[in-house]
Amino acid sequence: MTSIVLFCRPGFEKECGAEIQEKAAWNEMYGYLELKINQGLVFFHLHESAHGEALMNKLPLKRLIFARQWFVTVTDKIDLPDYNRVEAITEALGNDWQYSDLRMEMADDNDGKSLSKFCRKLSVPLRQALRKNKVLTQKGNNSADDPEGAILHALFLSGQEVILGFSLARNSSPHVMGIPRLKFPSASPSRSTLKLDEAFLHFIPRDEWDERLTSGMNAVDLGSAPGGWTYQLVRRGMMVTAIDNGLMAESLMETGQVKHKMMDGFKYVPLKQNVYWLVCDMIEKPQRVAKLMSEWLLHGHCKEAMFNLKLPMKGRYQQVTNDLQTIKDAFTKHNVKYELYAKHLYYDREEVTVHARLLSPAPLRAKE
């Protein structure tokens, strides 16, 4: 049986499963779910084997909110001996396909993490054997070298069990298990800074940073205190207006790049139409935040927005779907072209991060 394996944050398997099942049904592909609760793994077992690769070709991973990474299985669970595991894996895999990279992966729980050292040690002889068999290309260390290639995934359930599969380099995360490993900057006043750092890395292509994430831009941070998100803007050389009734970190104020206005983020409106970035991590009802973000963009108060929508305890997938639809409806009402993506990022917890921008002129922009 062919399955699609999806990685997500532990505790969000139901949301991840509901989403892939819904998106597959939209493409007339069906199957049933197997959820590995609190392991961050979802198995979507397809009724038709050909639908695994077909769905991966049709559905962009970036359109899935809760899935960090995914792959299509090419083997069932393989039992590994205590000796010569490499030979067992290469025999099960065969040599019909060629892959541009290898990902050694495991569940995102304590049992899975205990396998990380084992996987690192095994990856070296496994790569060598796969190259020798011409299953892994000689480069075989970076999927960016072959964006049209396939990635080989080895999901270790234990030291004695593995599932093999593939993803498409152009439609999968470049990170093992979809997890970027970011270092917390000691100069930041809050760990929330990693959320925005990851968001920029995830949503904005690196070859567009010089145009969209560059020094000299004006930015607004709603709900800014103590300055975790402001820090990411400042370190990129932007001039920031920080809006929050709380105090900002003195280290940020001393840069000369931050103006702090003590007021409600829902009431602030910029006097000039020269703001490029709006960022927002307010602990507020997601419906209110979604409405506010669409208003800022439609009125031309900013060019791009990066914001978090807090998730409820129950009905999380439905709630975030409704909030995104609110934004889409507002844009559609004014007949504008737009870009809107949401992702439950690694450094997010009970929230999802959303990126939005208009691709046509802001219809409600005031004439200067």
UniProtKB/Swiss-Prot annotation:
Gene3D superfamilies: 3.30.2300.20, 3.30.70.2810, Vaccinia Virus protein VP39 (3.40.50.150). One of its GO terms (molecular function) is S-adenosylmethionine-dependent methyltransferase activity. InterPro entries: RlmM_FDX (IPR040739), RlmM_THUMP-like (IPR048646), RNA_MeTrfase_FtsJ_dom (IPR002877), rRNA_MeTrfase_M (IPR011224), SAM-dependent_MTases_sf (IPR029063). One of its GO terms (biological process) is methylation. The keyword S-adenosyl-L-methionine applies. One of its GO terms (cellular component) is cytoplasm. Its main location: cytoplasm. It comes from the Bacteria. PANTHER family: RIBOSOMAL RNA LARGE SUBUNIT METHYLTRANSFERASE M, RIBOSOMAL RNA METHYLTRANSFERASE FTSJ DOMAIN-CONTAINING PROTEIN. NCBIfam families: PRK11760.1. This is Ribosomal RNA large subunit methyltransferase M. The lineage of its organism: Bacteria, Pseudomonadati, Pseudomonadota, Gammaproteobacteria, Alteromonadales.
